[in-house]
Amino acid sequence: MSRLISALQLSISAAIIATSLPSCAVNSGPPPKAEHVLYEWYDDQGPGEVKVKINLNTQLAHFTRGDREIGWSYVATGKEGHGTPSGTYRITEKLEEKFSGSYGWLEDEFGNVTNGDAKPSTKVPPGQKYMAAPMPYWQRITGYGIGMHAGVIPKPGETASHGCIRMPKEFAPVLFSVTKVGTPVTIEH
């Protein structure tokens, strides 16, 4: 009888231990979703000018310092009808906080978005308000409103913006910290 009780106690103890260990616990929820790695950064802070090269076909940006690659990132450039212009540019303005003067959304008094693609000229119904789109870590490259900034990358490898170059939110401040007014930016197909 004491052997049976000892075996039962051992089984119960093993079950308690097994379910308390994260690797052994039974998870009744859905499996975790795989997420894209949106960027990699390995800047050595060595000599050389930082340069940005953006490929509109792959929606990838590559960064170099001198002749060394220092990182890459997914971007989201202009969707159909709002294409990002190819060409060679230089950063002409840097602002940590900026809001779009051209795009935003409408939201009701509870903060629910009622129109996710509004402009300042959009008629605002009673009880709602226009919210200008935030563009943190803004780096202007044209005189007509195109720049790089933090934003949502909804589907890595696909366009999504109104013409700007969106960078992953976690990465935009990293790039912002190593660029300067005058940093070259090349955009190509």
Which stretches of residues belong to each language-model region?
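Soluble periplasmic/extracytoplasmic beta-strand elements of cell-envelope proteins
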Residues: 51-53, 60-64, 72-74, 90-92, ...
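Solvent-exposed coil/turn segments that connect beta secondary-structure elements
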Residues: 57-59, 66-69, 78-80, 94-97, ...
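Bacterial N-terminal signal peptides that target proteins for export
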Residues: 1-12
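Hydrophobic core
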Residues: 12, 16-21
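Exported/periplasmic cell-wall-interacting domains
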Residues: 24-29, 79-86, 105-189
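N-terminal post-signal-peptidase region of extra-cytosolic proteins
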Residues: 36-51, 56-57, 71-79, 84-89, ...
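Bacterial Sec signal peptide processing site at the extreme N-terminus
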Residues: 20-40
